[in-house]
Amino acid sequence: MKNIAIIGASGYTGAQITSLIHADAGLSVQGLYVSENSLDKGRELSELYPLYSHLPYVLNPLSDDVKAKIVAESDAVVLATEHSVSLELAAWFYQQGLAVFDLSGAYRFADVAQYPKWYGFEHTHPDVLAEAVYGLAEWNAAEIAKTRMIAVPGCYPTASLTALKPLKSLLTSAYPVINAVSGVTGAGRKAHLHTSFCEVSLTPYGVLGHRHQPEIATQLGQEVIFTPHLGNFKRGILATITVQLQPGTTEEQVKQAYEVYDNSPLVTVKHNAFPKVDDVVHTPNCHLGWKYDANSGYLVVASAIDNLMKGAASQGLQCIKIHFNL
């Protein structure tokens, strides 16, 4: 039994991964934690989320004494915190010997020069960053098992990379074009006018400037055009991706490329059939569907995931189970 502390548990992702860890026979929840300044400190998680009325956990303030208690009682810590908060907490817990599963973007780029541009801070822990592994579970399992610093991927990158990585050797130099729509839970739990019930509407955002674009490009090894959209639904992501394949590529080669997922139970691949968000919401699954026009050389692949599950919490759980061989 591995004990897992969860910091930032009051948010959607933190609450979701709490429920998953609680339900796993090989894991136990050491405790839930929020900032000492949080309005939610001292409250039960079920007060915030009646859906989780079966979870008997209080949101404790994260003091220095509490951090020491976490180190003494835990095998790992999950960080569902702001990027700048994870930057410091991840390094501290890693240096104390715990395994760290960071759901923020603070350790996703190996290159420290990326952080000022995309996250607005200088990376102050390059030594810990050098140990970090990108936690794309179906692709990096061997590395996840070896390191104690796992940067769980973003939601859009998970959907996009799961679709694109099998095709890498077949791509031309043309940029893949990714159009993706996410439910409003992707914007977090804090209230904002543009995500309120009466205001939310399907619209693109972060055009040619979203931080997930370089994350996708870095992990794919090729530049991409990425346009995210806000959808008027609660959860889920659908990414529709258009790519150009090398001249002479056959449909059979594409089928063979996607056979990489034959032993990946959470990834389903269909030819000439396309996924929908409703089929993956509240699941850890990724559904892919593709169609190829050999005459033009263009392939369209669609990828559907739950942004809070495969795009965050359940992939975090995958990484935990891979790391601890559970």
From Swiss-Prot:
Metabolic or biological pathway, per its Swiss-Prot or TrEMBL entry: Amino-acid biosynthesis; L-arginine biosynthesis; N(2)-acetyl-L-ornithine from L-glutamate: step 3/4
Catalysed reactions, semicolon-separated: N-acetyl-L-glutamate 5-semialdehyde + phosphate + NADP(+) = N-acetyl-L-glutamyl 5-phosphate + NADPH + H(+)
Superkingdom of source: Bacteria
GO molecular function: N-acetyl-gamma-glutamyl-phosphate reductase activity; NAD binding; NADP+ binding
GO biological process: L-arginine biosynthetic process
Protein name in the entry: N-acetyl-gamma-glutamyl-phosphate reductase
Role, per record: Catalyzes the NADPH-dependent reduction of N-acetyl-5-glutamyl phosphate to yield N-acetyl-L-glutamate 5-semialdehyde.
Active site feature: 155
Cellular component per GO, a single term: cytoplasm
Organism whose genome encodes this protein: Shewanella denitrificans (strain OS217 / ATCC BAA-1090 / DSM 15013)
Keywords: Amino-acid biosynthesis, Arginine biosynthesis, Cytoplasm, NADP, Oxidoreductase
Subcellular localization, as worded in the UniProt entry: Cytoplasm
Keyword Cytoplasm: yes
Family per similarity comment: Belongs to the NAGSA dehydrogenase family. Type 1 subfamily.
InterPro entries registered for this protein in UniProt: AGPR_AS (IPR023013), AGPR_type-1 (IPR000706), NAD(P)-bd_dom_sf (IPR036291), NAGSA_dehydrogenase (IPR050085), Semialdehyde_DH_NAD-bd (IPR000534)
CDD domains the UniProt entry points to: AGPR_1_C, AGPR_1_N
Record NCBIfam families: argC (TIGR01850)
Enzyme Commission number(s) of this protein: 1.2.1.38
SUPFAM superfamilies, per database record: Glyceraldehyde-3-phosphate dehydrogenase-like, C-terminal domain (SSF55347), NAD(P)-binding Rossmann-fold domains (SSF51735)
Record carries keyword Cytoplasm: yes
